[in-house]
Regions:
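Feature captures hydrophobic
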Residues: 125, 133-136, 143, 152-308
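Divalent-metal (often Zn2+) His-rich catalytic cores of metallo-beta-lactamase-fold enzymes
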Residues: 1-51, 55-96, 154, 158-161
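Solvent-exposed, amphipathic alpha-helical segments
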Residues: 31-45, 119-122, 265, 269-272
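Amphipathic alpha-helical repeat elements characteristic of tetratricopeptide repeat
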Residues: 29, 33, 113-120, 132, ...
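Short coil turns that delineate tetratricopeptide repeat
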Residues: 146-147
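Alpha-helical segment of the N-proximal tetratricopeptide repeat
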Residues: 105-140
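Helix-loop elements that line ligand-binding/catalytic pockets
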Residues: 73-79, 87-119, 228-230
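Alpha-helix boundary/N-cap detector
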Residues: 70, 74, 114, 118, ...
Length: 308
């Protein structure tokens, strides 16, 4: 609608020519509507998430332009994302209403198929004829309680096979990275823990930064806990109430305990560059109230700075 003669895209090549730009962007826009509308259509007809992945396919007319080819995401992922966003996690498949734990599922399935050896053989065969099935079987073997290095290697092979056959950079890069992960060739541990960076939290007020801690509670460590703590940092004040296996952000009013420190120290605690015990020992953190109760409350956090 702007009549632009040149378009620099966030994803994709630059375009020139007002008519060409208009036609190609219209096609791009229509491809998105197609995915949305057909996802809703098939969902209304009872399709599950897995079924949507195979029923909602972009027509051939969208396959001849870089803007609508599946170099980045893929249609089957978009369809499932649309469905989940509109209707929630349960897709109508009875198997998904009360699913087994991942490891339990793998062990039951492998046992039903004749054991790990039988499944390995089927997986190896499937990787030459049906990569999706092979990847699924390899994943189940790797989830098994008695998974071996051979099983993890088979999963890595399956992932690399899928990576070589997809046009999607997202899928390809994830599969290659996961293959390296399951082989132990790269350390992905930092992606499986809470991470807060100084630049990230520098612009947050105290209440926002303290409130983030609520999602780091380990419920098993909260049995019987009821500890309301005010946090005071350079003129700002908020509160954290450890109770009922949750951490409830408060204003700090009427809290019987107060933790005080500088903003630099507080940020250091959140980023893990200093621990609460170290800060208490150096005097960088002071506690007015029951010090042991405060330390015990904070130790319920799944965060290295507060773990006892």
């Amino acid at each position: 609608s702007l009549g632009a003669e040149h378009l620099v895209a966030t994803h994709g090549p630059p375009l020139s020519g007002a008519t060409d730009i208009d036609e190609r962007l219209r096609s791009y826009r229509d491809s998105i509507q197609f995915l949305w509308d057909q996802t809703v259509r098939w969902t209304n007809r009872g399709a599950t998430s897995a079924e949507l992945a195979h029923r909602v396919r972009l027509p051939e007319c969208f396959g001849d332009d870089w803007l609508t080819q599946q170099h980045y995401g893929i249609a089957e992922h978009h369809a499932r994302q649309i469905r989940t966003g509109l209707f929630g996690f349960f897709d109508g498949d009875p198997a998904n209403i009360l699913p087994l734990d991942t490891q339990d599922h793998a062990e039951h399935l492998i046992d039903a198929m004749g054991g790990q050896g039988a499944v390995r053989s089927r997986c190896e065969e499937a990787l030459t004829t049906d990569v999706r099935w092979g990847l699924y079987l390899a994943s189940q073997l790797a989830h098994h309680r008695e998974a071996s290095d051979e099983d993890r290697g088979l999963l890595a092979t399956a992932l690399r096979t899928a990576a070589r056959r997809t046009p999607s950079a997202n899928v390809r890069n994830w599969c290659i990275t996961k293959a390296l992960d399951v082989e132990g060739s790269i350390d992905m541990s930092r992606h499986r823990t809470h991470r807060l960076g100084r630049r990230q939290i520098a612009g947050w007020d105290l209440a926002t930064s303290a409130g983030v801690l609520r999602v780091m509670i380990e419920p098993k460590k909260m049995k019987g806990a009821d500890c309301h703590i005010a946090i005071e940092v350079e003129g700002e004040r908020c509160g954290l109430h450890f109770r009922n296996h949750i951490l409830c952000p408060t204003s700090g009013t009427d809290a019987p305990h107060t933790l005080s420190c500088t903003r630099a120290t507080w940020d250091g605690l959140l980023t893990g560059s200093v621990t609460l015990s170290e800060a208490l020992n150096t005097g960088a953190v002071t506690i007015n109230g029951d010090t042991d109760a405060v330390i015990s409350a904070f130790s319920a956090l799944d965060h290295p700075a507060f773990t006892r």
